[in-house]
A protein has these predicted regions:
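Short sequence/structural elements of tandem HEAT/ARM alpha-solenoid repeats
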Residues: 70-77, 110-115, 124-128, 163-171
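N-terminal "cap/leader" segments of large eukaryotic alpha-helical scaffolds
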Residues: 2-49
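Hydrophobic residues within the alpha-helices of tandem HEAT/HEAT-like
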Residues: 58-64, 97-106, 154-158
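Glycine-rich, aromatic-bearing surface loops/beta-hairpins
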Residues: 167-203
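Eukaryotic alpha-helical solenoid repeat scaffolds
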Residues: 103-138
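HEAT-repeat alpha-solenoid elements in large eukaryotic scaffold proteins
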Residues: 48-59, 105-111
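HEAT/HEAT-like alpha-solenoid repeats
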Residues: 37-49, 77-84, 88, 131-142, ...
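Residue-level detector of extended alpha-helical repeat arrays and alpha-solenoid scaffolds
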Residues: 51, 72, 91, 146-150, ...
């Protein structure tokens, strides 16, 4: 499958990726991020119930009504890096988290922001997994939940970085929706509309 080919020659461990950041200095909505490495390790090996629990916890520490926090970019970087090593439930939750992180906007006043928040940096971190998301869309065995997340990722990432639009559009058009959730085809059509060349909208 595509994930195996993507990881060919991949020898870096989850701990190696986690070691790229000093989590004791990264701020989240519930304090510093010292507990993130263990949560990522657990998510990578999780079953459905545990993955859901960890997803709720990670979302709670990273996102609020005020927008994303400083921890979003490093957490997104690590989640992308370990996607190929995750159990299917863990991967589904990670993709959902990445979709939410990429879509997060700063909606509160500056004094409510936690740490240094750079939306472009956050989206670039999420976009480092772009080829993986494309592969998931082209993979016939992908779950509906994973497809929903990856469609959302295409929408946000290619909308903000037009250099990704052509490949995103091709991947979306290649998704086979027969036998899938009824809303999937509608979501794809709406996303394709979002990604249409803006010049074609002028009339």
């Amino acid at each position: 499958v595509f994930a195996q080919s993507l990881c060919k020659g991949f020898r870096v461990s989850i701990d190696d990726h986690l070691a790229d950041f000093d989590w004791s200095r990264i701020q989240t909505y519930v304090g510093y991020a010292e507990m993130v490495p263990n949560a990522v390790r657990e998510l990578a090996a999780s079953d459905v119930k545990e993955a859901a629990r960890l997803g709720v916890w990670i979302e709670r520490i990273l996102l609020s009504v005020a927008g994303p926090c400083e921890g979003c970019a490093p957490v997104a970087t690590v989640l992308v890096a370990v996607l190929p090593r995750m159990t299917p439930p863990g991967r589904s939750v990670a993709l959902d988290l990445l979709s939410q992180i990429s879509a997060a906007e700063i909606t509160g006043p500056a004094h409510e922001q936690i740490g240094a928040v750079d939306l472009e940096e956050i989206r670039q971190a999420v976009a480092s997994g772009f080829q993986y998301y494309v592969g998931m869309l082209r993979e016939t065995a992908s779950s509906d939940a994973d497809l929903y997340s990856c469609i959302g990722l295409m929408d946000i990432l290619a909308f903000h970085d037009r250099s990704l639009a052509a490949e995103a559009i091709a991947a979306l058009k290649a998704v086979r929706t027969a036998g899938r959730a009824t809303g999937l085809a509608v979501l794809i059509d709406n996303t394709l509309d979002d990604l249409a060349d803006p010049s074609s909208d002028s009339a």
